[in-house]
Regions:
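Cytosolic juxtamembrane amphipathic/interface segments immediately preceding
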Residues: 3-25, 61-62, 156-168, 319-322
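Transmembrane alpha-helical segments and their short flanking loops
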Residues: 2-12, 54-55, 59-62, 261-262, ...
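Membrane-interface helix-loop-helix junctions at boundaries between adjacent transmembrane segments
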Residues: 96-97, 110-217
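The catalytic core of metal-dependent phosphodiesterases that act on cyclic dinucleotides
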Residues: 558-632
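Helix-loop-helix junctions within the multi-pass membrane cores of secondary transporters/permeases
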Residues: 2-10, 250-337
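Active-site core of bacterial EAL-family cyclic-dinucleotide phosphodiesterase domains
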Residues: 431-502, 601
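Catalytic core of bacterial c-di-GMP phosphodiesterases, primarily the EAL and HD-GYP domains
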Residues: 508-584
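Early transmembrane hairpin of solute transport permeases
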Residues: 10-153, 328, 342, 348
Length: 637
């Protein structure tokens, strides 16, 4: 049963819809942070600062901050509709990916009946749930209809531009989908007699919470639903904005009225109560998660995420941590992500009921940092102390789950890398090498990450050369072969053919070849004082590297920087792909040979190069593929 449920969760997590939501939310991070900090700077709780904003350049600074908020976090439904649909189009691996955002936005506006005639802006954060549902559904339908339309050859115009044919093939799917959503939206508005039904996200949740009041049961349900939505990539806090207004929007006003009347405040729960004591650092008590990550994480990339996310989490902006780790769709982290705010709700409630902390009587913007917000909300330092206690409780809850998540992450990454090595080995055998960085490769996202890691490792000097001795028939040391080695911090050592393929597809193979040539020459200089006889040092290169116009000039320039007397360099060409011997290539190789550089052909016989190449007399050495000679001993034929 556990294996089956794990398989189901894995399939869901790797589905195109889940991947699109994760990627879309990640791409939206710059706009979320821009909007959050604009809100913080616009509403920072300081009278002197607010006076400055009002009077500076006639209020231009305040208006600018309002504008930045409106076009980013204030238009969150629009931002996520674009990023998620674009991610879906890229995941679908078609040339029509750019049309997905257009179709999704048009479908959403058609469903809403346009932007006019509504009580509120249809791209506000409160509309996120509705917008994401319409976006995903329109993308799924568009993809399926495109597949069906591609079979209709009559839609193809011979001789016309490629983009024209794509547009024509997309015409009917786009019209059908947008018109369909327009009809459904119109039917809903007609049946309910209100345009508000269009925002069915708020409508559904308002009905769910309709019979609940702002008591402990209601607040706990609100916290759980909020974080379940967050876990599935939906901005839960904004989606339930209408619910929070219904449950406890008025509670602080009630408390303030009671205080003015000389009575004790009675309303315990409010939005400020949650923002101040439960949502520390944002959803899921992100600040506790980040601190736990800094304390317990053994992975450098996770610690870096924590360091990057920490400054924004201090102002309760959690997106970097939640989407970067990630927590969403990470079922190992689902338990602490939901459990932590539930526990903090209970501890904060008990503290207030026991009189340890005053009841919240002042509204505080959610962007006000920890400690300051606790003090301002309660008017007492006890509020700040409760925040610290809750923060510690959250850290203790998160620690064991972070350990478990990192273990699973390591095993999954290692498994994918081993699969990439198997795909490369199979491709070398068949003559069809895998394209790791192509969208159609099943582990494309992992390969992209690995290519970036490889490039960064090269820039930091973390790539190494190991040397394999070559002995003569008499047992004397004839030479050494330089072998590329890189120990990835998660996957361990990775097969060199995979690294070369990633560097080639990533566009930095030539930079890598110069890096390795420099490294080999430095090692050769270090070796010179310890040898008396001549020694041949072989350095592997590929035919793809030789295709660069400046390869030979740059290689010769590097080699001539080092004074080598006993160590002779050999450029060993690996026969992993076909090499075209042109007159220009022969002249370039001859120039290096005249400078004392030898050439060797490795793995000859794999089937890529012709035996006629040996007649050109440009190779000083030919190494046969092991498969040609492995069966010679004992073979009577």
């Amino acid at each position: 049963m556990e294996s089956r449920s794990s398989s189901i969760m894995s399939r869901f997590r790797n589905s195109i819809s889940a991947q699109s939501i994760r990627s879309g939310l990640t791409m939206a991070i710059p706009f979320l942070i821009m909007g959050s900090f604009s809100l913080l700077l616009r509403n920072f709780p300081s009278d002197a600062y607010q006076a400055f904003l009002v009077h500076f350049l006639g209020g231009a600074a305040a208006e600018l901050l309002e504008t930045l908020y409106t076009v980013s976090l204030g238009s969150l439904a629009l931002v996520l509709s674009i990023t998620i649909s674009l991610s879906y189009g890229l995941q679908a691996k078609t040339d029509t990916f750019i049309l997905y955002p257009v179709v999704s936005i048009c479908s959403y506006l058609a469903f809403c009946g346009g932007m006019e005639g509504h009580d509120e802006y249809v791209f506000k954060a409160e509309w996120v749930f509705t917008a994401m549902c319409i976006t995903l559904l329109s993308c799924v339908l568009f993809r399926q209809l495109l597949k069906f339309g591609s079979r209709l050859r009559k839609l193809h115009t011979t001789g016309a531009e490629y983009l024209f044919n794509i547009s024509i093939q997309s015409l009917f799917p786009a019209v059908i989908i947008v018109a369909g959503f327009a009809v459904v939206g119109y039917a809903l508005r007609t049946a309910w007699g209100s345009s508000n039904i269009t925002n069915f996200g708020s409508y559904i949740f308002l009905n769910i919470f309709d019979r609940l009041s702002g008591n402990l049961a209601g607040i706990l349900l609100y916290v759980v639903v909020t974080h379940v939505l967050w876990f599935f990539g939906i901005h839960g806090t904004n989606t339930l904005e209408a619910v929070s207004q219904k449950l406890f929007e008025h509670n602080i006003s009630v408390n303030q009225s009671l205080l003015l009347a000389g009575s004790a405040p009675t309303e315990l729960f409010s939005k400020t109560f949650l923002d101040t004591f439960v949502f520390l650092g944002g959803c899921g008590c992100a600040l506790s998660f980040i601190i736990a990550l800094c304390i317990i994480s053994r992975k450098s990339h996770n610690r870096k995420i924590a360091y990057v996310a920490l400054p924004s989490a201090l102002f309760n902006i959690s997106e970097i941590a939640v989407f970067g780790f990630p927590i969403i769709f990470n079922f190992t982290m689902m338990i602490p992500f939901i459990l932590t705010p539930v526990v903090l709700t209970l501890t904060s409630t008990l503290a207030a009921q026991a009189g340890l902390v005053p009841v919240v009587t002042q509204s505080v913007e959610w962007t006000v940092p920890i400690l300051l917000s606790g003090y301002k909300a309660t008017g007492s330092v006890a509020g700040s102390i409760l925040q610290l206690v809750n923060l510690l409780i959250g850290v203790l809850i998160y620690i064991p789950f972070i350990k478990r998540s990192e273990q699973k992450e390591t095993l999954a990454f290692q498994k994918i890398v081993r699969r990439m090595e198997q795909d490369m080995a199979a491709g070398e055998g068949s003559g069809t090498l895998p394209h790791f960085l192509h969208h159609r490769y099943p582990y494309y996202s992992y390969a992209k990450t690995l290519a970036m890691d490889l490039s960064n490792a090269m820039q930091r000097g973390q790539l190494e050369l190991f040397y394999q001795p070559q002995l003569s028939s008499g047992g004397n040391l004839h030479g050494m072969e330089a072998l590329l080695r890189w120990k990835h911090p998660v996957a361990g050592y990775i097969a060199p053919p995979v690294l070369i393929a990633l560097a080639y597809e990533g566009g930095f193979l030539h930079e890598l070849s110069r890096y390795l040539l420099n490294l080999a020459c430095r090692d050769a200089v270090s070796l010179e004082p310890h040898i008396k006889n001549d020694l041949y040092l072989s350095i592997n290169i590929s035919s793809k590297q030789m295709e660069e116009n400046s390869f030979f000039d740059k290689s010769l320039d590097i080699i001539q920087r080092y004074k080598l007397e006993h160590v002779h360099l050999v450029l060993e060409i690996t026969e992993r792909s076909a090499m075209i011997i042109s007159d220009t290539l022969m002249r370039d190789m001859s120039r290096l040979k005249d400078s004392g550089i030898s050439f060797s052909l490795d793995d000859f016989g794999m089937g890529h190069n012709s035996i006629l190449y040996l007649q050109e007399r440009i190779f000083d050495e030919v190494k046969l593929d092991g498969k040609l000679v492995s069966q010679l001993p004992g073979n009577e034929r």
